[in-house]
Amino acid sequence: MIIHNLGIKDYTEIWEQMKAFTAIRDSNSCDELWLLEHYPVYTQGQAGKPEHVLNPNSIKIVQSDRGGQVTYHGPGQLVAYVLMDIRRRNLGIRTLVAKLEEILISVLKHYKIPANIRSGAPGVYVGEKKIASIGLRVKNGCTYHGIALNVNMDLSPFLGINPCGFAKMEMTQMSHFHPNIQLEEVSQHFVQYFLTQFK
């Protein structure tokens, strides 16, 4: 597993790089984990509906090829893209999603934030509020896209959408529990737990 820390990046630029990486990889290619933040952007998944974008203001909307519906990415949110040959690892997509949820819950538990999952609604929640989203694409047995964990960000752009297609879905973030939390530190813990699941 090769890990890249990419800093803050434009969504479309990284999306194109993920597609290019996946298109040229073969059975000998190493899996990769890309860690980054995005400049403000709304992304529509393949199941996304235009009516779930309520008031985008000046924030760009990108129609993506990942699973799921609409979400928001912005600075202070940890994004981890999982470029993995799940066929080689003999992993189903549902198993991968479940493992990613486990990893996120472990990270949050480390900070004593009580997190849970919901049946039929991928992602991770604290009570009724969503703290992390998951959306993947599989092509030729290989995944791209991944997870987004709200660490210490401006959550107000989520009010301009129905997050993940759920009207009035409230969002939360780690800084509500730990005001001085740093994204870089959270990223390190995420990698640690990720590598316990995926060598």
Curated annotation (Swiss-Prot):
- Catalytic activity, as annotated: octanoyl-[ACP] + L-lysyl-[protein] = N(6)-octanoyl-L-lysyl-[protein] + holo-[ACP] + H(+)
Q: Does the keyword Cell wall biogenesis/degradation apply?
A: no
What's the stated role of this polypeptide? Catalyzes the transfer of endogenously produced octanoic acid from octanoyl-acyl-carrier-protein onto the lipoyl domains of lipoate-dependent enzymes. Lipoyl-ACP can also act as a substrate although octanoyl-ACP is likely to be the physiological substrate.
Q: Which domain of life is it from?
A: Bacteria
> NCBIfam families per the record?
lipB, PRK14342.1
* Pathway noted in the entry: Protein modification; protein lipoylation via endogenous pathway; protein N(6)-(lipoyl)lysine from octanoyl-[acyl-carrier-protein]: step 1/2
Q: What is this protein called?
A: Octanoyltransferase
Q: Which residues form the BPL/LPL catalytic domain?
A: 27-199
Q: Which residues bind substrate?
A: 66-73, 133-135, 146-148
